[in-house]
Amino acid sequence: MELETHLSKYFTLAFTHKSMSLEMREKLAINSPIMLKELLQTIKTHCPNIKECMVLSTCNRFEIYASLKHGANTHEQKSALLKILAQNKKMSVSDLEKCVLINTDESAVHHVFSVCSSLDSLVVGETQITGQMKNAYKFAFEEKFCSKDLTRLLHFAFKCAAKVRNLTGISKQGVSISSVAVKEALSIFEKERIKDKKALVIGLGEMAQLVIKHLLNKQFEVLILGRNAAKFEDFVKELEEPKKVGFQNVENLNAYINEYELLFCATSSPNFIVRNSMLKETIFRRFWFDLAVPRNIEKPTLNHIFLYSVDDLEPMVKENVGNRQESRTKAYEIVGLATMEFYQWIQSLEVEPLIKDLRELARISAQKELQKALKKRYVPKEYEGNIEKILHNAFNTFLHHPTIALKKNAQKEESDVLVGAIKNLFNLDKSNANHAQNLNLYKCEYYEE
């Protein structure tokens, strides 16, 4: 009889800035919890061989992480997911096929760890991706699209990312999309000899807040256009120079859009916020940075407006990360080791319950025979306690070597066969229902950095 493996089969499907254009990433981008839940539900409904699933959508990547049922065909899962995305996003399967990156098993785990550790980011070492992955996992977990398998994977990924940051210093070198955009803006400011260090920022999400902080560090005055005044008040409390920041409702955009040389836009809107119909000719040149995906700024038709997208910043990013190569090499060593340690950890999780079950089976068998002996008066009742101790010690001695051997072999590839054989031999194979009760043992600390 073929024994089923108890290790999870991991699968990742990814589109990134390395393989897909900004225009196509815009179509895939998910900008609301409702859209995300609908996509996850569609996957759950139409892909029965996918046990658990989560989606990561950022300005530079769209990725699906899944665990598959035993025996699931990865090519079939890839085809099914591409078909769902094509229908959901009104794209062609052939276009998606050209850009997709697929990883399974160990390579899938390595990929997730690399992404979480910011080694696959446009800006290597930026920490924003870890928070984005935590939010993506948190949503999928709370909406019951992922459970034990992805919880274990993401738990270890966050640990790996922290280790990479702590041991390599790769995140301490101050380069991010927001910092590169502000650095380029400062360079423009100096070349253009702009008198007033003022900037207009549309949005108050994570990216926009980072831009604002970088601008303030460069002594800019910032006007923020947003929708949530209460969020602005909370944000201002974090700033060292709150007096240099103002706030207006984004509905007043028309009143300000033609007044600033420097503009940064980073919102989650699926549509253009800045449109050509709002624009007027000015006597000064304007430099705009659209850091959103999908883009928030319609391509200007007026002269003297220079627009930078996320992808336009990539060459500038590469200029700033050259000194990270040594840290990156060390980081990949950590990720490779973490991938091996993850599978050792997973295998040990399968062995520990087996050892516990073997000891419990021995205890129950001994107790059953002791009660028979007492009932038939083979031994006096007053000896019951002493006999229990003797039996307990005897079975501990008997199981000592098998216990050590199981723990030792837990880190070997053949452990699945060994564990499966013992469970089958002693009739200890239980349904996976019990695993749900132990979920909190592995639940990710997605609120921690």
Curated annotation (Swiss-Prot):
**Site annotation Important for activity: residues:** H111
| Miscellaneous field | During catalysis, the active site Cys acts as a nucleophile attacking the alpha-carbonyl group of tRNA-bound glutamate with the formation of a thioester intermediate between enzyme and glutamate, and the concomitant release of tRNA(Glu). The thioester intermediate is finally reduced by direct hydride transfer from NADPH, to form the product GSA.
For this UniProt record, the keywords arranged alphabetically read as follows: NADP, Oxidoreductase, Porphyrin biosynthesis
Pfam families in UniProt: GlutR_dimer, GlutR_N, Shikimate_DH
Organism whose genome encodes this protein: Helicobacter pylori (strain J99 / ATCC 700824) (Campylobacter pylori J99)
Per the record, the domain of life is Bacteria
Protein name in UniProt: Glutamyl-tRNA reductase
What residues bind NADP(+), as annotated? Answer: G203, L204, G205, E206, M207, A208
What family does this chain come from, according to its entry?
Answer: Belongs to the glutamyl-tRNA reductase family.
Listed binding positions for substrate are: T58, C59, N60, R61, S121, E126, T127, Q128, Q132
Q: What does this protein do?
A: Catalyzes the NADPH-dependent reduction of glutamyl-tRNA(Glu) to glutamate 1-semialdehyde (GSA).
Entry remark concerning the domains of this protein: Possesses an unusual extended V-shaped dimeric structure with each monomer consisting of three distinct domains arranged along a curved 'spinal' alpha-helix. The N-terminal catalytic domain specifically recognizes the glutamate moiety of the substrate. The second domain is the NADPH-binding domain, and the third C-terminal domain is responsible for dimerization.
- Molecular function (GO) terms listed? glutamyl-tRNA reductase activity; NADP binding
Pathway annotation = Porphyrin-containing compound metabolism; protoporphyrin-IX biosynthesis; 5-aminolevulinate from L-glutamyl-tRNA(Glu): step 1/2
Question: What is catalysed by this protein?
Answer: (S)-4-amino-5-oxopentanoate + tRNA(Glu) + NADP(+) = L-glutamyl-tRNA(Glu) + NADPH + H(+)
